Every structure is written in C-alpha cells, then in structure tokens.
Amino acid sequence: MKPSVVMIEPNGHFCSDCAIRTSAVCSSLDAAELREFEHLGRRVHFSSGETVFSEEDITTSFYNVLEGVMRLYKLLPDGRRQIVGFALPGDFLGMNLSGRHNFSADAIGAVTVCQFAKAPFGRFIEERPQLLRRINELAIRELSQARDHMVLLGRRSADEKVAAFLLGWRERLLALKGASDTVPLPMSRQDIADYLGLTIETVSRTFTKLERHGAIAIIHGGISLLDPARVEALAAA
C-alpha cells in the first residue's frame, strides 16, 4: 500500500496551525519565515506497519513527525531485529553523515509526517542560523537518547530495564501530553523486547511481576503507575 500524500499549499497555514509548532524543528522561525517554510514540505500519512524509510536507502528527505509513533530499527545479519528507538511528534528524522539512512522506520498505528526534500531544505537553512541551531539541539537530544539506550542495554536486570523503559517513555510523553500516571504503550511487547534486548516472554513476565507487586496496573493500551517511587527505585538500581 502506498502512503497517501497531501501537498502543503502556500495558503494552507499548515505550519502555523500545527499542534507541535512550539516543539518542532520549525519552532525557531518567525511568521514570515514560516510562510516560506510551508512551500518546502508536504504532509504524508502512513497506515500502521507501513515503511517510512529503510536502512541503507539514500537519504533524499527529512521527516518531522506530526502525529503517531514510529518504530526505528536495524536488522542484524542473522535476521534478528534490534529496535534502536521510538519516534514521537516533534522528532526530526533523516540526519546522518553517510548520506544513507542508518536504520529503518515504520509506523506504529497511523502516522503523519511533514516531509522535506533534502536539497531545498539544506538551502533554506543556510541563511537561517537559528534553524541550524535548532537542528543541532535535536541532534544532541537524539545522541543523548542513544547513550541512554546503550546504558539500558548494559549490565542491568530485566526488571531494571523494563522499569527504566517505562519511566523514560513516560518522561518523553510528558512534554506532549502533560503529567500523568497513565502511560500509553502503542508498541507491542515484542517491540519492547527488541528495544531492551530481552525475549518477549521475559518482558511479559516482568510486567506481570510489577503488577503483582503493586507497582503498576496493566490496562488496555498501556499501564498505570500505582507506585511510581517503587518503579523509580528499581530503575535507579
């Protein structure tokens, strides 16, 4: 299935009306720059499971996530999948040094992105140092998340990994949805396992164990933190 594409018209005001305007890559632009910026992008809608881009593809576009969650992953030589991250609204994808994507991305549920062709986007930022600074900020944030993931994959128990994942995911959602003890988990248990370097059976047992100990409640589409302090102590172990 091909994604449906909606071109951004110059008078559509898609950027100024964007729900993530204040946190997106374009947040550093003024009103006049934003109107020019609208000409560069197009909105693309992906259904659940559709590929946004594939590892080793030549990078021809940048992607600003507007709605939904994306799964970012690499395939190992033996066919196993290692999930390297999950992209949320406001995340900016496509930055790399090699000119090729170094991971694949597909949609978890419905996803909408703002897609920018690489060459005109590059020309646009050359005259706008504030936009380049914003891109650098996003790149530093991505690097920080990658380092956190490396620590998560290190010498930690399954309980510690799952607890740290839940708190880290909750923290990322905080900026989008505000504080809440309910943590939506749009990804599958298999996705979480592939992110943490565990088996799906271990992840499922750990969720059940945390619920049995009164730390969380497993609800439809996610979990509820019943005892955040207990989960925080476990994640910090």
Swiss-Prot record:
<dbReference type="GO" id="GO:0005829">
    <property type="term" value="C:cytosol"/>
</dbReference>
<feature type="domain" description="HTH crp-type">
    <location>
        <begin position="156"/>
        <end position="229"/>
    </location>
</feature>
<dbReference type="GO" id="GO:0003677">
    <property type="term" value="F:DNA binding"/>
</dbReference>
<dbReference type="GO" id="GO:0003700">
    <property type="term" value="F:DNA-binding transcription factor activity"/>
</dbReference>
<protein>
    <recommendedName>
        <fullName>Nitrogen fixation regulation protein FixK</fullName>
    </recommendedName>
</protein>
<keyword id="KW-0535">Nitrogen fixation</keyword>
<keyword id="KW-0804">Transcription</keyword>
<dbReference type="InterPro" id="IPR018490">
    <property type="entry name" value="cNMP-bd_dom_sf"/>
</dbReference>
<dbReference type="Pfam" id="PF13545">
    <property type="entry name" value="HTH_Crp_2"/>
</dbReference>
<keyword id="KW-0805">Transcription regulation</keyword>
<keyword id="KW-0010">Activator</keyword>
<comment type="function">
    <text>B.japonicum has two FixLJ-dependent FixK homologs that are activators of the transcription of a group of genes involved in anaerobic processes such as denitrification and possibly nitrogen fixation. FixK may bind DNA at the FNR consensus binding site.</text>
</comment>
<feature type="DNA-binding region" description="H-T-H motif">
    <location>
        <begin position="189"/>
        <end position="208"/>
    </location>
</feature>
<dbReference type="InterPro" id="IPR036390">
    <property type="entry name" value="WH_DNA-bd_sf"/>
</dbReference>
<dbReference type="GO" id="GO:0009399">
    <property type="term" value="P:nitrogen fixation"/>
</dbReference>
<dbReference type="InterPro" id="IPR000595">
    <property type="entry name" value="cNMP-bd_dom"/>
</dbReference>
<dbReference type="InterPro" id="IPR012318">
    <property type="entry name" value="HTH_CRP"/>
</dbReference>
<dbReference type="InterPro" id="IPR014710">
    <property type="entry name" value="RmlC-like_jellyroll"/>
</dbReference>
<keyword id="KW-0238">DNA-binding</keyword>
<dbReference type="InterPro" id="IPR036388">
    <property type="entry name" value="WH-like_DNA-bd_sf"/>
</dbReference>
<dbReference type="Pfam" id="PF00027">
    <property type="entry name" value="cNMP_binding"/>
</dbReference>
<dbReference type="InterPro" id="IPR018335">
    <property type="entry name" value="Tscrpt_reg_HTH_Crp-type_CS"/>
</dbReference>
<dbReference type="InterPro" id="IPR050397">
    <property type="entry name" value="Env_Response_Regulators"/>
</dbReference>
